[in-house]
Amino acid sequence: MEHTLFGCLRSPHATSQGLHPFAQSSLALHGRSDHMSYPDLSSSSSSCILTGYPNEESMFGSQHHRGHHHHHHHHHQQQQHQTLQSNWHIPQMSSPPASTRHSLCLQQDSGPPDLSGSPSILCSNTSSLGTNNSTGAACVTGDYGRQSLSPAEAEKRTGKRKSDSSDSQEGSYKSDVNSKPRKERTAFTKEQIRELEAEFAHHNYLTRLRRYEIAVNLDLTERQVKVWFQNRRMKWKRVKGGQQGAAAREKELVNVKKGTLLPSELSGIRSNSLQHTADSLTNDDSHDSSQSSEHAHL
C-alpha cells in the first residue's frame, strides 16, 4: 500500500520493508489467525503529524484489489481495522485538501530553516485531530524585540531627541561663552585719576590730539583714556539729572512755605475754580426750574 496511515510516522532512514506494514501483517496471517502483527509505533523517530485521514475505503480499498488475498484474509483485515480503531481511537474525518496536507507535515530530510536572514516567520501548528480546522497555522513574526510605534509616539521621541540635542548645543555654547576670560578692568592709580578728573573739569570731550597727550603723560593707552571719559560723562549726566530734580523739589518747598505758587499750580487752581463756578451755575438753574414747576403745580 503506497498511501497508508503510517506514511508520515515512518522514519526517513527506514528500510524498504517499512513501506508496506499492512502487506507484512497480511502475510503473517497465513500462519497465525488470532494474533495480529502491528508496526512498532514507539520506535518511530519521526516528528511528523498525521495529515491525511483516509476513510475506511481509502485505507483498505487497495487490499481488496490484490489478487493473492483471499476472503479469509479480507475478514481478518476488517477485524484488524476494528481492533486498530478500538486501540487508537482514530476519528473518522474528511481528508483535508492536498495543499493543507502538504503544508502541515514537516520534512525531516531538509535542514533546519535559515534564521540568519531577515526576521523569520515562525509557524506553529494549532490544529488537532479532533477539530475540523484545515489551516490551523498560527504564524507569529520572529521579531519579538521590536514593537510597532504609533506616529504620535514616534514624533514625540524625535521631538524629544531634537530638544535634547538643542539643549546640549546651548549648554556647550554657554560653557564656551563663560569659559572666555573677561577683560580685566584697568586699575587706575590715584595720580592718574586726579589728572583725568582735572581734565574732565575743563573739557568733557577730548580731541584726538589731547587724548594722545594724556595717554602718553599718564602711561595709558588711548582706548583706556577714551573709555574713562565715556564712563565719566555718563556718571555726570546721572548726577546732573538727580541734582536738577532735587533743586526743583527744594524750590517748590520754599514757595509753599512763602505762600507763593508756581505757574503750574496757578493754572491748576484756575481750572478748578472755573469748574466750580460752572457747577454752581448748573445747580442754580436746576433749582430755579424746580421752583417754577412747583408754582405751576400750585
Swiss-Prot record:
Keywords: Activator, Developmental protein, DNA-binding, Homeobox, Nucleus, Transcription, Transcription regulation. Its main location: nucleus. The keyword Hydrolase does not apply. The keyword Ribonucleoprotein does not apply. Residues 109-122 have a biased composition (Low complexity). Residues 57-122, 143-186, 277-298 are annotated as: Disordered. InterPro entries: HD, HD_metazoa, Homeobox_CS, Homeodomain-like_sf, MOX-1/MOX-2. The polyhistidine repeat may act as a targeting signal to nuclear speckles. Mesodermal transcription factor that plays a key role in somitogenesis and somitogenesis and limb muscle differentiation. Required during limb development for normal appendicular muscle formation and for the normal regulation of myogenic genes. Also acts as a negative regulator of angiogenesis. This is Homeobox protein MOX-2. It comes from Xenopus laevis (African clawed frog). The lineage of its organism: Eukaryota, Metazoa, Chordata, Craniata, Vertebrata. The gene is meox2.
